[in-house]
Amino acid sequence: MKLADLAHLLGAECHGKPDSEITGVAGIEEAGPGHVTFVANPKYAGLARKTKAGAVLVAPSFPEIEAPTLRIKNPYLAFARAIEIFYPAPSYPSGIHPTAAIDPTARIGEGASIGAYVVVGENCVIGDHATILPHVVIYPNVQVGDYFFAHAHAVVREACRLGDHVILQNGVVVGSDGYGFAKDDAGKWHKIVQSGPAIIEDYVEIQANSCIDRASVGETRIGRGAKIDNLVQVGHGSSVGENTLLCAQVGLAGSTHIGDDAVLAGQVGVAGHCHISDRVIVTAQSGVGGNIEAGKIISGSPAYDNRQWLRVCAIMPRLPELLKQFERKRKTANE
């Protein structure tokens, strides 16, 4: 593909060598003459000046470099679109594989693709153009929307509802039983029936081996456009707001409520019944034990204001020496 044609597809402004051939994408340090790459952060301008790439996606204000540039407001998003251009997703033929077990009461939408050994239970509704890959199991009374995509070995439990353009990666379980038990007078634990479904709204993606538990009563809900990374646990009766990000190994205890546009970085843990408001950022490995106001950035365990936490981190390596100084001064004062 000529660079000028790629620029047109991306809506970018081409600077230099419009007739050069672009054959793929690569990171800025690995890119060669046939690759397009990107720089979204000005601090990497040095790498852009050294790159051997055939073209670099940059912001309009980015300084001139030797390599040809494609100038666009959001270089990172444009790079993502370039990947789609050069490496289109595989397509799957519509129809039902002969080994799939589809209950006669299930309704399968137009253009849906049902792979080998898929199980679809009674009274399920599968949306138009859904793609369900081998060994996916969908329990009875489930509804999934149009363009739903489930990778191999995903499971959707009974009565859950998933919207349009939802993606489940391999090994995801939606609607597994919440962790609920009641102790009797003899000290024995009794399972609490988890009666409420998990609801997954439109354009949610849940990545590999994550679990969204069903609720004991009520529902567990993942809001429109939320993105959930690998190995995430969402406890029963919790809610996750629209466009919120839960990074790898986040754990939400039951009845946790996360607002819109929040970010919980890797290995964040949240205690039950906490409310984390809109636009909150919780940095990696933090432990949240209380409610968090909108727009806050918090860190640590227990989590508190990020700026204060950074100051504490800066002091920590000096504590042994500060303690020695304190002990010397106290000894001097007592003499």
Spans of model-derived segments:
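Terminal amphipathic alpha-helical/low-complexity segments used for targeting or macromolecular assembly
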Residues: 1-99, 111, 160, 165, ...
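Structural signal for interior beta-strand "rungs" in well-ordered beta-sheet cores
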Residues: 38, 95-305
